[in-house]
Amino acid sequence: MERLRYYIAQFLSYTLHPGIMPTAGTIFIISTLPEVFTWDFVIRITSVVFLGTYVGPLVGILILRISGVISSVHLIKREERIYPYLIGAASMIATGNHLERAGVPVEITLSVYLSGMVVVLSTILLPFFKSSAHAAGVSAFYALYICLHQRYGGGEIQYLVLGAMVLGGLSWARLELKRHTLNELLSGALLGFVPMFLLLSK
Protein backbone atom coordinates (compact mmCIF):
# COMPACT_ATOMS: atom_id res chain seq x y z
CA MET A 1 0.00 0.00 0.00
CA GLU A 2 2.84 2.37 0.84
CA ARG A 3 4.41 1.77 -2.57
CA LEU A 4 1.08 2.41 -4.30
CA ARG A 5 0.70 5.69 -2.44
CA TYR A 6 4.19 6.67 -3.55
CA TYR A 7 3.39 5.97 -7.21
CA ILE A 8 0.11 7.88 -7.01
CA ALA A 9 1.89 10.83 -5.42
CA GLN A 10 4.56 10.78 -8.13
CA PHE A 11 1.90 10.59 -10.84
CA LEU A 12 0.06 13.61 -9.46
CA SER A 13 3.30 15.57 -9.09
CA TYR A 14 4.36 14.94 -12.69
CA THR A 15 0.87 15.38 -14.16
CA LEU A 16 0.31 18.68 -12.34
CA HIS A 17 3.81 20.01 -12.93
CA PRO A 18 3.89 23.82 -12.56
CA GLY A 19 5.69 24.17 -15.89
CA ILE A 20 2.66 23.00 -17.87
CA MET A 21 0.11 25.17 -16.07
CA PRO A 22 0.60 28.28 -18.29
CA THR A 23 0.06 26.12 -21.38
CA ALA A 24 -3.03 24.51 -19.86
CA GLY A 25 -4.26 27.98 -18.95
CA THR A 26 -3.72 29.23 -22.50
CA ILE A 27 -5.74 26.35 -23.95
CA PHE A 28 -8.53 27.01 -21.45
CA ILE A 29 -8.56 30.75 -22.19
CA ILE A 30 -8.78 30.16 -25.95
CA SER A 31 -11.63 27.67 -25.46
CA THR A 32 -13.52 30.07 -23.17
CA LEU A 33 -13.26 33.42 -24.99
CA PRO A 34 -16.24 34.30 -27.21
CA GLU A 35 -13.99 34.95 -30.21
CA VAL A 36 -13.43 32.26 -32.83
CA PHE A 37 -9.78 31.40 -33.47
CA THR A 38 -8.24 29.47 -36.34
CA TRP A 39 -6.39 26.23 -35.63
CA ASP A 40 -3.22 27.87 -36.93
CA PHE A 41 -3.55 30.61 -34.30
CA VAL A 42 -4.30 28.14 -31.51
CA ILE A 43 -1.31 25.93 -32.35
CA ARG A 44 1.03 28.88 -32.82
CA ILE A 45 0.15 30.66 -29.57
CA THR A 46 0.03 27.46 -27.52
CA SER A 47 3.43 26.45 -28.90
CA VAL A 48 4.94 29.84 -28.01
CA VAL A 49 3.63 29.60 -24.45
CA PHE A 50 4.83 26.00 -24.07
CA LEU A 51 8.30 26.81 -25.38
CA GLY A 52 8.64 29.94 -23.26
CA THR A 53 7.20 28.69 -19.98
CA TYR A 54 8.20 25.02 -20.01
CA VAL A 55 10.92 24.18 -22.52
CA GLY A 56 12.99 27.33 -21.88
CA PRO A 57 13.12 26.93 -18.08
CA LEU A 58 13.69 23.17 -18.45
CA VAL A 59 16.67 23.70 -20.75
CA GLY A 60 18.04 26.19 -18.24
CA ILE A 61 17.71 23.64 -15.42
CA LEU A 62 19.42 20.94 -17.50
CA ILE A 63 22.32 23.29 -18.29
CA LEU A 64 22.68 24.15 -14.60
CA ARG A 65 22.65 20.45 -13.72
CA ILE A 66 25.24 19.52 -16.36
CA SER A 67 27.48 22.39 -15.28
CA GLY A 68 27.23 21.29 -11.65
CA VAL A 69 25.55 24.43 -10.36
CA ILE A 70 22.67 22.33 -9.00
CA SER A 71 22.81 18.74 -7.77
CA SER A 72 19.38 17.61 -8.99
CA VAL A 73 16.80 18.65 -11.56
CA HIS A 74 14.16 18.13 -8.87
CA LEU A 75 15.44 21.22 -6.99
CA ILE A 76 14.88 19.65 -3.60
CA LYS A 77 17.37 21.94 -1.84
CA ARG A 78 16.01 25.43 -1.25
CA GLU A 79 19.25 27.23 -2.14
CA GLU A 80 19.45 25.43 -5.49
CA ARG A 81 16.17 26.94 -6.68
CA ILE A 82 17.48 30.49 -7.04
CA TYR A 83 19.16 30.29 -10.47
CA PRO A 84 16.53 28.00 -12.03
CA TYR A 85 13.78 30.31 -10.77
CA LEU A 86 15.50 33.39 -12.18
CA ILE A 87 15.95 31.69 -15.56
CA GLY A 88 12.32 30.56 -15.52
CA ALA A 89 11.04 34.02 -14.60
CA ALA A 90 13.12 35.68 -17.32
CA SER A 91 11.84 33.21 -19.91
CA MET A 92 8.22 33.71 -18.86
CA ILE A 93 8.47 37.50 -18.85
CA ALA A 94 10.13 37.46 -22.29
CA THR A 95 7.34 35.19 -23.53
CA GLY A 96 4.72 37.54 -22.13
CA ASN A 97 6.40 40.48 -23.87
CA HIS A 98 6.41 38.61 -27.17
CA LEU A 99 2.73 37.71 -26.81
CA GLU A 100 1.83 41.29 -25.91
CA ARG A 101 3.51 42.61 -29.06
CA ALA A 102 1.82 39.88 -31.11
CA GLY A 103 -1.58 41.17 -30.03
CA VAL A 104 -2.94 37.95 -28.52
CA PRO A 105 -5.92 38.07 -26.12
CA VAL A 106 -4.95 40.05 -23.03
CA GLU A 107 -5.95 37.20 -20.71
CA ILE A 108 -3.20 35.01 -22.18
CA THR A 109 -0.58 37.74 -21.92
CA LEU A 110 -1.53 38.58 -18.32
CA SER A 111 -1.53 34.93 -17.23
CA VAL A 112 1.98 34.42 -18.62
CA TYR A 113 3.25 37.65 -17.05
CA LEU A 114 1.68 36.62 -13.75
CA SER A 115 3.37 33.23 -13.94
CA GLY A 116 6.70 35.03 -14.19
CA MET A 117 5.77 37.34 -11.33
CA VAL A 118 4.88 34.39 -9.09
CA VAL A 119 8.28 32.84 -9.79
CA VAL A 120 9.98 36.16 -8.94
CA LEU A 121 8.08 36.37 -5.65
CA SER A 122 8.97 32.76 -4.87
CA THR A 123 12.63 33.59 -5.52
CA ILE A 124 12.50 36.55 -3.14
CA LEU A 125 11.05 34.31 -0.43
CA LEU A 126 13.63 31.55 -0.88
CA PRO A 127 16.00 32.82 1.87
CA PHE A 128 13.15 32.27 4.33
CA PHE A 129 11.40 29.16 2.99
CA LYS A 130 10.62 27.40 -0.28
CA SER A 131 7.04 27.91 -1.38
CA SER A 132 5.55 25.04 -3.34
CA ALA A 133 5.75 25.74 -7.08
CA HIS A 134 3.28 22.91 -7.68
CA ALA A 135 0.70 24.48 -5.36
CA ALA A 136 1.30 27.90 -6.94
CA GLY A 137 0.76 26.55 -10.46
CA VAL A 138 -2.46 24.68 -9.73
CA SER A 139 -3.84 27.51 -7.57
CA ALA A 140 -3.12 30.05 -10.31
CA PHE A 141 -5.00 27.88 -12.81
CA TYR A 142 -7.86 27.55 -10.33
CA ALA A 143 -8.01 31.34 -9.97
CA LEU A 144 -7.95 31.68 -13.76
CA TYR A 145 -10.87 29.25 -14.02
CA ILE A 146 -12.91 31.22 -11.48
CA CYS A 147 -12.20 34.56 -13.18
CA LEU A 148 -13.11 33.33 -16.66
CA HIS A 149 -16.23 31.70 -15.25
CA GLN A 150 -17.26 35.05 -13.74
CA ARG A 151 -16.40 37.05 -16.86
CA TYR A 152 -17.52 34.79 -19.71
CA GLY A 153 -19.48 31.99 -18.06
CA GLY A 154 -16.79 29.53 -19.07
CA GLY A 155 -16.69 26.15 -17.37
CA GLU A 156 -19.17 24.56 -15.00
CA ILE A 157 -19.68 25.01 -11.26
CA GLN A 158 -19.00 21.34 -10.57
CA TYR A 159 -15.53 21.73 -12.05
CA LEU A 160 -14.77 24.35 -9.40
CA VAL A 161 -15.40 21.65 -6.80
CA LEU A 162 -13.29 19.22 -8.82
CA GLY A 163 -10.51 21.81 -9.00
CA ALA A 164 -10.50 22.16 -5.22
CA MET A 165 -10.27 18.37 -4.93
CA VAL A 166 -7.35 18.32 -7.38
CA LEU A 167 -5.54 20.96 -5.33
CA GLY A 168 -6.15 18.88 -2.22
CA GLY A 169 -4.85 15.76 -3.97
CA LEU A 170 -1.73 17.59 -5.11
CA SER A 171 -1.09 18.88 -1.59
CA TRP A 172 -1.37 15.33 -0.26
CA ALA A 173 1.06 14.12 -2.95
CA ARG A 174 3.71 16.70 -2.09
CA LEU A 175 3.37 15.91 1.61
CA GLU A 176 3.50 12.18 0.90
CA LEU A 177 6.74 12.64 -1.04
CA LYS A 178 8.07 14.82 1.79
CA ARG A 179 8.90 17.59 -0.67
CA HIS A 180 7.08 20.31 1.27
CA THR A 181 5.59 21.20 4.61
CA LEU A 182 1.99 22.32 4.99
CA ASN A 183 3.12 25.94 5.38
CA GLU A 184 5.12 25.77 2.14
CA LEU A 185 2.10 24.38 0.31
CA LEU A 186 -0.15 27.09 1.74
CA SER A 187 2.26 29.89 0.84
CA GLY A 188 2.59 28.50 -2.68
CA ALA A 189 -1.18 28.30 -3.07
CA LEU A 190 -1.57 31.91 -1.94
CA LEU A 191 1.23 33.10 -4.24
CA GLY A 192 -0.47 31.47 -7.19
CA PHE A 193 -4.09 32.27 -6.44
CA VAL A 194 -4.11 35.83 -5.09
CA PRO A 195 -2.26 37.73 -7.89
CA MET A 196 -4.13 35.89 -10.65
CA PHE A 197 -7.51 36.43 -9.05
CA LEU A 198 -6.94 40.10 -8.20
CA LEU A 199 -5.82 41.01 -11.71
CA LEU A 200 -8.19 38.95 -13.85
CA SER A 201 -11.31 39.35 -11.72
CA LYS A 202 -11.51 43.06 -12.64
Show where each model-derived region lies.
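Transmembrane alpha-helical segments of multi-pass membrane transport proteins and ion-pumping complexes
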Residues: 18, 22-23, 53-65, 89-93, ...
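Short, Lys/Arg-rich, polar N-terminal cytosolic tail immediately upstream
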Residues: 1-9
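Membrane-interface helix-boundary motifs at transmembrane edges
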Residues: 37-40, 67-79, 101-106, 179-183
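Juxtamembrane helix-capping/reentrant segments at transmembrane boundaries
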Residues: 12, 72-87
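C-terminal halves and exits of single transmembrane alpha-helices
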Residues: 85-104, 126-131
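Loop-to-helix transition at the N-terminal end of transmembrane alpha-helices
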Residues: 39-55, 77-79, 186-189
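The first (N-terminal) embedded transmembrane alpha-helix
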Residues: 12-33
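Membrane-embedded catalytic cores of phosphoryl/pyrophosphoryl-handling enzymes
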Residues: 108-202
